[in-house]
Amino acid sequence: MKEATAKITGISEKDGKTLVTLDQTIFFPTGGGQSCDVGKLGGYDVVDVFEADDDIFHEVCTTQVLDGDREQNSLQIGDEIEISIDWAHRFDNMQRHCGEHIMSGIFFELYGGVNRGFHMGEDYMTIDISLEEKPEFNKITWEMAKEVELRTNMVIWQNLPVITRHFDKREEAENLPLRKALAFDEDITIVCVGSVDNPADCVACCGTHPATAGQVGMVKIYKVESNKGMFRIYFEAGERAFRQYQERFDVLTILENKLSAGFSDLMDKYEAQQEKVKESKNQLYHLKKAVIKKEAEEIKNNMRPAFAKKYDILSINDILDIGKELQGSIDTIAFLVHSPSNTVLLFSDKHDCGKLVKENASIYGGKGGGRKQSARAIFTKEEYVDTFMDLIEKHLR
């Protein structure tokens, strides 16, 4: 049911929110790991639905802009109103929740895995599986997860019926082949995927589900990780799983085109490229070492009362490495400048570089600091770099 008529039985304000209760509702409240329905109530947006004090509360946006005008709350207790749910949102929840049921049932059947936690997030769903019923299994491998994924989709492809049954007493419900023991004694709802005699899954649940397993569409597992003695399964179901598959396939196609590779040899091409990258990094490392050593020797051989040189290509870390090579051989001061960032790196075995920066950089809007043998000053303009170095050189004469 997507639409209905209901009577307002209560309107209250709490924490700045307007909460409405009805004599009957088609809105599913948040619960059991599933998010609530959203939709319309008397023309107003329903943004949250929850159960409390044996009633269902609908949070509505009662101040909204309609046709360019701001309309205030016109809802009154006793009003007969139209209510409707956002069916796309409901069906999305149904697909995901039922997909989780089927997959949990397969984990239990194959490996004795008990679902101890379920979260339906915006980007993915998770279940926490505890291996309890079959002692021969002590971990969930990726191959095991792939088998569960396949078996889950096989159930979906069979388009088995999803049967919901209600029981007043625990004793009546316990006659079914339940995956998990019941947690309550009365007013029990059981959801079975497949025949009651031999279901793919059968468990107590208050959530929403499609009429058949085929409506789930598909299930895809993305990741398995250990978590607090259990195994957390990241997965998606329904249209979301399909759309995520499309997105990932698009990325895969882009990579194939960039690497001029087909799917079957994509990994080989990628690994070959990684080897080239590794080789290039190794060559660059040795080239930089040679350049740094050569620069350090040049500075040592041309040391005057002050030495200054600007670098456009070398990084700040490279320039710092040059400074390390100079340690113990600078009886004056060396200014090595990283031009792209207007950063002056000072090195000296005689003068206190940190003190020089602290006392003089701010004169030209610079900032920085450092130790006695090395320091840095950063400026906003190149002209301040030159003026700063001239000032220090004159100060040290």
Locations of the language-model features?
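Short amphipathic
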Residues: 3, 7-10, 166, 303-313
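Short, hydrophobic/aliphatic alpha-helical segments
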Residues: 9-26, 78-91, 184-200, 349-366, ...
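A generic structural motif
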Residues: 18-20, 53-68, 125-130, 343-345, ...
